[in-house]
C-alpha cells in the first residue's frame, strides 16, 4: 500500500512539474507543420474563445504562440496540427529572438476573431471558389452574402470581405462566345437580371456598379477586402466605368457608349489605372490589366512567382500578408492570372511578382482607413481550372503555400494595431 502511495506521489509530482513547465503552445509554420491550413482555423477558434495569440512574423514560417490551455491542446490534437508544448523560459527566449533588432522578425498580437463575409451567389456555378474551400477546410466560420445584402447595408456588420470569380462589369465573365447556349449561362443571366429588377436597377451592370461602389466605401471606412481572379480586375474596371457603358448589347440590351474608353475615371479605382477595356463580347478578356503567361511558361513545372521580403518591424502589414514556409510559389492560371505592372497605381505595394518583374501576382494597398488585397489566379492547387472541373480536395494539399496566402488575409484584420514607427 505504501509502495503504491509513493508511486502515485511521484507520478503526480512529475505531472505537476511538466504542467508547470508547459506554459505556452507553439504552432510551428515551417516545413515541419503537418497541416498549415487547419492551423489558421485553430488560431481563429482560439481567438473566438477569448484568448490572444501571438503571430511570430518570419519565425519558422510565421508561427503562432499562445498561452497553454487544455482546450486548445485538445483542438490541436483533433485537427491533426503539429504543435509543441514549451515552458516559460523557452517562450521568452523565442520572443527575445523575434524582437531582437538584429533579426527581421516581430511579434503581432491577434486579439479578436474577424467577422468574415464571402461575396458569392447562392446559384451553383460550374467552378470552385478557392476562399470558400480554404475557409471550409480550415474550419473558419463565415457568412455568405451577395448583391441584396450589400445594397441593403449589411456589409458594415463584417470586418473582412472576400470576392472571387465575380464580374462587376455585368458581362457574366465574358463567357458569351463559348457558353452563351449552355444551360448554366442562360440561368445565370436570367437570375442576375431578375435580381437587378427586384433591387430597383434597370440592368445588371448598374446593380454591380452599385455593389462595387458600396464595397469601395466600406474599405474607405476601415474594412478589409480580399479579391481573387476576375473579382479583382473587374472590380476596378466597373468603378472606372461609372460614367459610361462598356457592356455590349448581348449583355445589357443596349449599345456601348461610343467614347467609352475615354470616359473611364481612374481616380476612383483602387489598384489599377490607365488600362484599356475590351468591349468585344466575343473576346474572353476584360482589359489589358491581365497578362496571360507566354505559351512556353503555361506549365505548372515552369510557372512560378516570388514573394517579396519586408521589414517585419517597420512594415508589419505586407509582412503578415506574405508569411509562408516557402519564398517561391507555383503559379496558377485564372481569368485574371497576373497583373501588368505598368497598370498598377504607385500607392499599391507589390507582394509577389513573376520572373522578369513585369507582371504581378499578389498586391495590396491602403484606401482610406482600410486595406485591399488582390491575388491573381483561380485555384492555387489546380493550374488550369476549367469550367465544369470538380473542386480541389484540400485534404490533399494541407500545406499549400498558395492557399496560405489566402488565409494570411483572414487573420490580418485580427491584428492589434501598432503605432507607426517614425
Positions of predicted regions on the chain:
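Positively charged n-region of N-terminal signal peptides that target proteins for export
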Residues: 1-4
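Bacterial N-terminal signal peptides
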Residues: 7-17
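Hydrophobic targeting/anchoring helices
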Residues: 22-129, 138
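Extracellular ligand-binding/catalytic regions of CAZymes and related secreted enzymes
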Residues: 23-65, 245, 343-422
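Helical hinge/lid and interdomain linker segments adjacent to catalytic or ligand-binding clefts
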Residues: 24-25, 30-34, 64-74, 124-232, ...
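Alpha-helical scaffolding within the catalytic cores
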Residues: 99-104, 148-150, 357-361
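Catalytic beta-strand/loop cores that center a nucleophilic Ser/Cys/Thr
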Residues: 129, 136, 233, 263-385
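Catalytic cores of eukaryotic secretory-pathway lumenal/extracellular enzymes that build
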Residues: 200-201, 240, 249-251, 257-262
